From Swiss-Prot:
Residues 71-384 form the Peptidase A1 domain. One of its GO terms (biological process) is apoptotic process. Glycosylated. Has phosphorylcholine-substituted oligosaccharide N-glycans. Its EC number is 3.4.23.-. Expressed in intestine, muscles, pharynx and hypodermis. PANTHER family: ASPARTIC PROTEASE 6 (PTHR47966:SF16), BETA-SITE APP-CLEAVING ENZYME, ISOFORM A-RELATED (PTHR47966). Residues 1-15 form the signal peptide. This is Aspartic protease 6. Belongs to the peptidase A1 family. Glycans are attached at N74. One of its GO terms (molecular function) is aspartic-type endopeptidase activity. It comes from Caenorhabditis elegans. Aspartic protease.
Length: 389
């Protein structure tokens, strides 16, 4: 009995809460719009789809366009630590970073050297992952993964399986990141690999089987503070009182039901599946609904850039999303974004999942307005007002 009590106390003592500070950086998409290069990139994407029309069909990761992320975090892998910059992505589930055999498109990337890590365990199984924009391939390995930069307080997760890329597509070539850290469920992961955070929960490393995300407003310069991911607890420093929880309709993505979208005179009350996605800098939804919201805001669609331009001084009112019995209102400061050169964008895009999965992506404009609480253990999402400084 004494042994059992001692083990229980030790177990409680080992569980913890970790805060992972992130930085904001202008997305590749926004940079290309600002410099007039985005139409050429869109043409490249159209040509890619024309050559391989079935490549993106029915893929669980096709929600992701990694030209569209804006918030980045540091991780380390191995013993001693090797550092990497990654997208912290709730819209996918796999962790991968480049390895030393990745040459094309990897010249500016940090690469994981398995021979330099005393805790590395060879797996050898090959893997390939295809996103809505971009792909990567290589072999799997196992090592200790730590959330946070070297020298910071880190969440350390031993025996974590991850991808070591020998090839990445040109989509990732000029990104400010080395790889992707997926935070969604194992059921979404390629090859059924247990994601690092799920692995931490399975090992009892966290106080609670959840994490919360607070995103700051978009920065005025790259590499400034962008927010905090809190693992194992709700962030009560940067987030207000919980509004409500909403059960997940699918524990793959963080997918749940929304019952309406409204802005000004326009409203749509169809109940749809939506996902919370930290890796998408805009809101994404059906063409007809996004068009209606944009028109109500006074935004105009630009076919050349495939975006909605809006007057930077516009004050159209809140964009209201009904989830459960509550209405969540996004202020214009979070859905009107500066594209440079005196231009601003209505931060939404037409999105078609092809009949599979969610109808809407609730990206950074929603998460900047409301802290999102990813309650993995209870398979539900929670929302609390962001306490922006």
């Amino acid at each position: 009995m004494k042994t059992f009590i001692l083990l229980a106390v030790l177990g409680l003592a080992s569980a913890s809460v970790h805060q992972h500070k992130i930085v904001w950086r202008e997305s590749k998409k926004m940079g290309m719009i600002r410099t007039g290069q985005y139409p050429a990139y869109l043409e490249y994407q159209r040509n890619l789809r024309a050559v391989s029309p079935n490549v993106l069909a029915n893929l669980p990761q096709n929600v992701n366009d990694f030209g569209d992320f804006e918030y980045l975090g540091n991780i380390t892998i191995g013993t001693p630590d090797q550092g990497f910059i990654v997208v912290l992505d709730t819209g996918s589930s796999n962790l991968w970073i480049p390895g030393p055999t990745c040459k094309t498109n990897c010249k500016t990337k940090s690469k994981f050297d398995s021979t330099a890590s005393s805790t590395f365990v060879k797996n050898g199984k090959s893997w390939t992952i295809q996103y809505g924009s971009g792909d990567a391939a290589g072999i799997l390995g196992q090592d200790t993964v730590r959330f946070g930069a070297k020298g910071d307080s880190q969440l350390s997760v031993p025996t974590t399986t991850f991808g070591i890329a020998s090839k990445i597509s040109a989509d990732f070539k000029n990104d400010a990141t080395d790889g992707i850290l997926g935070l969604a469920f194992t059921s979404l992961a390629v090859d059924g690999v247990v994601p690092p955070l799920i692995n931490a929960i399975n090992q009892g490393i966290l106080d609670q089987p959840l994490f919360s995300v607070w995103l700051e407003h978009r920065g005025a310069a790259n590499n400034v503070g962008g927010g905090v991911f809190t693992y194992g607890a709700i962030d009560t420093t940067n987030c207000g009182a919980l509004v409500a929880y909403q059960p997940l309709s699918s524990a793959t993505y963080y997918q749940f039901k929304a019952a309406g979208f409204k802005l000004g005179s326009y409203s749509n009350t169809k109940t749809v599946d939506v996902i919370s996605d930290t890796g998408t800098s805009f809101l994404g939804g059906p063409q007809s609904v996004v068009d209606g919201l944009a028109k109500a805001a006074g935004a105009t669609y630009d076919d050349f850039n495939e975006v909605y331009f809006i007057d930077c001084a516009a004050q159209p009112g809140t964009l209201d999303i009904t989830i459960g019995t509550n209405t969540y209102s996004i202020q214009p400061v979070n859905y009107i974004v500066d594209a440079g050169n005196g231009q601003c964008l209505f931060a939404a895009f037409p999105f078609d999942f092809g009949g599979f999965g969610p109808s809407w992506i609730l990206g950074d404009p929603f998460i900047r307005q409301y802290c999102n609480i990813y309650d993995i253990g209870n398979k539900r999402m929670g929302f609390a007002p962001s306490l922006q400084k």
